């Protein structure tokens, strides 16, 4: 006798079904057209193969190809088809792993001769053939003995290693697509034909097996796939636009910074780049002052013992830089480390001197330079470096002050992003992971506060910010908010964080005296807005395509002469611009004015003031904006007034206009 289960549907209805019914049979019972469009089903939020039995009661939903959740399946299946195509064309190739990643997928292959870009065209053609065959995906559960034997006979030794690493309590799944098969956790769609043709192989790269430089080098083929051609075209167009906006190229053209092999992941800031960096710091320093933060500075180098207390030496050591004094190089009496994070130093500052509940909240902020070892292959311009500056802050407060502090941080973060033109923001609350410190009661309390804060934010900023909850994604020491912004070409960047910490104050014995004269452990909030200031500057350069807002631009104005007869006049104008706080230089070179304009435009100078004999006689200038072929004739007074207003940072504009 079959067991009956109760299923809840998205429309709120509930029905009973046999437990052994499959997802496909469920779809067919609803409608034949739904079954034809179905690619998988979801039970209590977990995506499953349509061939899987339902097995239990729960919230069920049929996933069709138009569903956003189908995109991961399309890409996953595409990775399998890529592997089959490679082995059809190059039979000696071993397949290893092929996961879905952001915006696409990849597959790593082991062969003596690495693939080239020319090979991708051939492989892609073969993939389209395989998709056209429309072979069904079929799942089998194998014993470990059978799996080891079959893959060993195929000389798929990387797969054998993977099989040996799978825990005994997990099923060993094999997915067929026609005659070809692969080891895989699944799930998959019904057939290769459901993938469609909206895919493209993107590039070839090297990758170490399991990311370990001691292991063999493999060839990685990257690809992308979408549900339809329009989405694929939009993505490829975005990539073209991103290449034009690449901050590394613009950094060279604008003479902002450079890197060199003696300091991998370390930035050499040039004058203009450093000016932009300082503009960012000055902006944030004013915002922090308005929100009653105390700016501090903790040492760059600290003894290992402190990092052992904080826990970093145990769980973050491989990402840290050791520092051993040269005089002690042999006996290693002291081992120091360059700080990878600012938080332990801020706890020491909080502990210096007795604190009362009346002193709280205490908000400590630092533009702290931190060092983290990143693999050389992951370094990427300003976006991924080994030495960077965090706009870090740590708030020490009472439990009763926690919600208000989180809301205040939220307001500061959102207004900051708005000042830089970012209007599409998403906020995610990450809750307790499996491995964590602190009691369940402590987590229950903290999460209830954070969820309450999230609801308040949703109400206050209705329609302006997208919110979601990510179960199990919090840090081991507390739940957190993550802020993600969308740039001018639709890319998302995770920047701001608000992170509760139950761990560090306890480790260092931080306390304050409460109203009953008892010692109490403060609540500690980690908070960042830009995150890495270097990375945020890279995001800004790409978002604005180098055409920075006047207040942030490293070189705001160039006064360029048409003739030497206007040289003295141009110098006087430049002096007047500087006198009102504008960044201006004079170009008196004996070059044609079009040459000067073209050169300064390449360097992304926002405003060029053109001066000739006529302008000198009429006390005027011709203003030319970056990206515009037009010039506007203005009096010097009007030009200075206009540019002074534009160059005022947005936070100061609010004060002026209040």
From Swiss-Prot:
GO cellular component: cytosol
Protein localization: Cytoplasm
Binding site residues for Zn(2+): 343, 394, 526
Catalytic activity from the UniProt record: tRNA(Thr) + L-threonine + ATP = L-threonyl-tRNA(Thr) + AMP + diphosphate + H(+)
Keywords associated with the record: Aminoacyl-tRNA synthetase, ATP-binding, Cytoplasm, Ligase, Metal-binding, Nucleotide-binding, Protein biosynthesis, RNA-binding, tRNA-binding, Zinc
Chain ranges of the TGS domain: 1-64
GO MF annotations in UniProt: ATP binding; metal ion binding; threonine-tRNA ligase activity; tRNA binding
Role summary: Catalyzes the attachment of threonine to tRNA(Thr) in a two-step reaction: L-threonine is first activated by ATP to form Thr-AMP and then transferred to the acceptor end of tRNA(Thr). Also edits incorrectly charged L-seryl-tRNA(Thr).
PANTHER family: THREONINE--TRNA LIGASE, CHLOROPLASTIC_MITOCHONDRIAL 2, THREONINE-TRNA LIGASE
Protein name (database record): Threonine--tRNA ligase
Protein's organism: Bartonella tribocorum (strain CIP 105476 / IBS 506)
Gene: thrS
């Amino acid at each position: 006798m079959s067991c009956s289960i109760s299923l809840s549907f998205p429309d709120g209805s509930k029905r009973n079904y046999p437990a052994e019914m499959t997802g496909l049979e469920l779809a067919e019972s609803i409608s034949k057209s739904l079954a034809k469009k179905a690619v998988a089903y979801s039970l209590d939020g977990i995506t499953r193969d349509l061939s899987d039995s339902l097995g239990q009661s729960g919230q069920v939903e049929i996933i069709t190809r138009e569903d956003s959740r189908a995109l991961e399946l399309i890409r996953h299946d595409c990775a399998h088809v890529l592997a089959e195509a490679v082995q059809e064309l190059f039979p000696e190739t071993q397949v290893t792993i092929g996961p879905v990643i952001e915006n696409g997928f990849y597959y790593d292959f082991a062969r003596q001769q690495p693939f080239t870009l020319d090979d991708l065209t051939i492989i892609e053609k073969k993939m389209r053939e395989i998709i056209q065959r429309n072979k069904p995906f079929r799942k089998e559960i194998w014993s470990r003995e059978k799996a080891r034997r079959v893959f060993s006979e195929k000389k798929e030794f990387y797969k054998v290693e993977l099989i040996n690493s799978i825990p005994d309590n997990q099923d060993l799944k094999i997915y067929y697509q026609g005659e070809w098969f692969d080891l895989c956790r699944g799930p998959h769609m019904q057939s290769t034909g459901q993938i469609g043709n909206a895919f493209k192989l993107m590039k070839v790269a090297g990758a170490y097996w399991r990311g370990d430089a001691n292991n063999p080098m493999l060839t990685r083929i990257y690809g992308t796939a979408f549900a339809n051609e329009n989405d694929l075209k939009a993505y490829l167009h975005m990539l073209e636009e991103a290449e034009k906006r690449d901050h590394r190229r613009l950094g060279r053209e604008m003479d902002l910074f450079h890197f060199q092999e003696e300091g991998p992941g370390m930035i050499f800031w040039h004058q203009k780049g450093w000016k932009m960096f300082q503009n960012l710091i000055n902006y944030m320093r004013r915002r922090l002052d308005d929100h009653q933060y105390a700016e501090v500075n903790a040492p760059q180098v600290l003894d290992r013992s402190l990092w052992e207390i904080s826990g970093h030496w145990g769980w973050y050591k491989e990402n840290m830089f050791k520092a051993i004094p040269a005089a002690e190089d042999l006996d290693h009496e002291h081992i120091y480390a360059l700080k990878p994070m600012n938080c332990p130093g801020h706890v020491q500052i909080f502990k210096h001197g007795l604190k009362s509940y009346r002193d709280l909240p205490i908000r400590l902020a630092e533009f702290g330079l931190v060092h983290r070892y990143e693999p050389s292959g992951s370094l990427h311009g300003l976006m991924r470096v080994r030495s960077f500056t965090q706009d870090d802050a740590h708030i020490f407060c009472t439990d009763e002050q926690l919600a208000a502090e989180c809301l205040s941080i939220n307001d500061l973060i959102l207004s900051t992003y708005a000042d830089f033109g970012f209007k599409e923001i998403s906020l995610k609350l990450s809750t307790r992971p499996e491995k964590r410190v602190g009691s369940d009661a402590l987590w229950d309390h903290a999460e209830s506060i954070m969820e309450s804060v999230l609801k308040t934010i949703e109400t206050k900023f209705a329609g302006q910010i997208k919110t979601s909850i990510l179960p199990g994604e919090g840090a081991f020491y507390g739940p957190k908010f993550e802020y993600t912004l969308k740039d001018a070409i639709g890319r998302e960047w995770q920047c701001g964080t608000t992170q509760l910490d139950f761990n560090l104050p306890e480790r260092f014995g931080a306390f304050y005296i409460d109203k009953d004269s008892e010692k109490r452990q403060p609540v500690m909030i980690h908070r960042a807005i830009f995150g890495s200031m270097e990375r945020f500057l890279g995001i800004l350069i790409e978002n604005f395509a180098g055409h920075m807002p006047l207040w942030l631009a490293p070189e705001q104005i160039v006064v360029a002469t048409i003739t030497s007869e206007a040289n003295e006049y141009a110098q006087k104008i430049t002096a007047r611009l500087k006198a009102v706080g504008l960044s201006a230089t004079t170009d008196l070179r004996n070059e044609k004015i079009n040459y000067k304009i073209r050169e300064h435009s390449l360097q992304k100078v926002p405003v060029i003031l053109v001066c000739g004999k006529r302008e000198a006689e009429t006390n005027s200038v011709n203003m030319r904006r970056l990206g515009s072929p037009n010039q506007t004739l203005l009096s010097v007074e009007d030009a200075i007034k206009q540019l002074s207003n534009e160059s005022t940072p947005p936070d100061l504009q609010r004060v002026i206009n209040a």
